[in-house]
């Protein structure tokens, strides 16, 4: 949703500046990701949208669920989100924060979808090959989709490499019906 992204951008940029100045992007990245996951929870969303829940209680409740250590800057950030009725955009803030971190580090996220579970050495080999192809460090998120039949589908940014059997069958069908 473009509107959510637009609303979240200044929050993500401000939080990224604070994390950069503190010099611990790794710890901040973990904290922001966790806060994004918590804010995406339907129960938290319902509380955030409930006008009968006081803001200070909502902020305290939200922070009590966070397992990572929460510093004063993060507490103030959550308070700011709650005061501006923006806690529900935290998942998008986390996504944009992560994108800013990746841009700074010259890395990217890669979404790998496989027909079968992929882990261990085969996953490491695939990620290494993809890092050579894209020329940057990649952080893999792996999903399983049996409908691929075989092979993998890889998404890095807006680039997609689909070597799945399903994609090959679709290409054959297109070629055969075009005649």
UniProtKB/Swiss-Prot annotation:
Q: Which GO terms describe its cellular component?
A: plasma membrane; proton-transporting ATP synthase complex
Keywords from UniProt, A to Z, are:
ATP synthesis, Cell inner membrane, Cell membrane, CF(1), Hydrogen ion transport, Ion transport, Membrane, Transport
State a single Gene Ontology molecular function: proton-transporting ATP synthase activity, rotational mechanism
Cell location? Cell inner membrane
Q: Does the keyword Cell membrane apply?
A: yes
Q: Which InterPro entries match?
A: ATP_synth_OSCP/delta_N_sf, ATPase_OSCP/dsu
The source's domain of life comes to Bacteria
Query: How does the record classify its membrane topology?
Result: Peripheral membrane protein
- Primary localisation category: membrane
Family of this protein: Belongs to the ATPase delta chain family.
Question: What is its quaternary makeup?
Answer: F-type ATPases have 2 components, F(1) - the catalytic core - and F(0) - the membrane proton channel. F(1) has five subunits: alpha(3), beta(3), gamma(1), delta(1), epsilon(1). F(0) has three main subunits: a(1), b(2) and c(10-14). The alpha and beta chains form an alternating ring which encloses part of the gamma chain. F(1) is attached to F(0) by a central stalk formed by the gamma and epsilon chains, while a peripheral stalk is formed by the delta and b chains.
Per its database record, what is this protein's job?
A: F(1)F(0) ATP synthase produces ATP from ADP in the presence of a proton or sodium gradient. F-type ATPases consist of two structural domains, F(1) containing the extramembraneous catalytic core and F(0) containing the membrane proton channel, linked together by a central stalk and a peripheral stalk. During catalysis, ATP synthesis in the catalytic domain of F(1) is coupled via a rotary mechanism of the central stalk subunits to proton translocation. This protein is part of the stalk that links CF(0) to CF(1). It either transmits conformational changes from CF(0) to CF(1) or is implicated in proton conduction.
**Protein name listed in UniProt:** ATP synthase subunit delta
Q: Which organism is it from?
A: Cupriavidus pinatubonensis (strain JMP 134 / LMG 1197)
Q: What is the lineage of its organism?
A: Bacteria, Pseudomonadati, Pseudomonadota, Betaproteobacteria, Burkholderiales
- Gene that encodes it: atpH
């Amino acid at each position: 949703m473009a509107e959510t992204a637009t609303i979240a951008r200044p929050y993500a940029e401000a939080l990224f500046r604070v994390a950069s100045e503190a010099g611990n992007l790794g710890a901040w990245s973990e904290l922001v990701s966790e806060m994004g996951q918590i804010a995406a929870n339907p129960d938290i969303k319902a509380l955030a949208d409930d006008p009968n829940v006081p803001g200070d209680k909502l902020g305290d409740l939200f922070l009590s669920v966070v397992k990572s250590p929460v510093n004063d800057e993060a507490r103030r950030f959550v308070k700011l989100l709650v005061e501006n009725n923006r806690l529900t955009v935290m998942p998008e803030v986390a996504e944009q924060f992560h994108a800013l971190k990746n841009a700074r580090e010259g890395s990217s996220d890669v979404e790998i979808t496989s027909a079968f579970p992929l882990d261990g050495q085969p996953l490491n080999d695939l990620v290494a090959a993809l890092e050579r192809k894209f020329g940057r460090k990649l952080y893999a998120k792996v999903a399983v989709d049996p409908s691929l039949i075989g092979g993998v589908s890889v998404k890095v940014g807006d680039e997609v490499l689909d070597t799945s059997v399903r994609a090959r069958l679709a290409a054959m069908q297109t070629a055969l019906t075009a005649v």
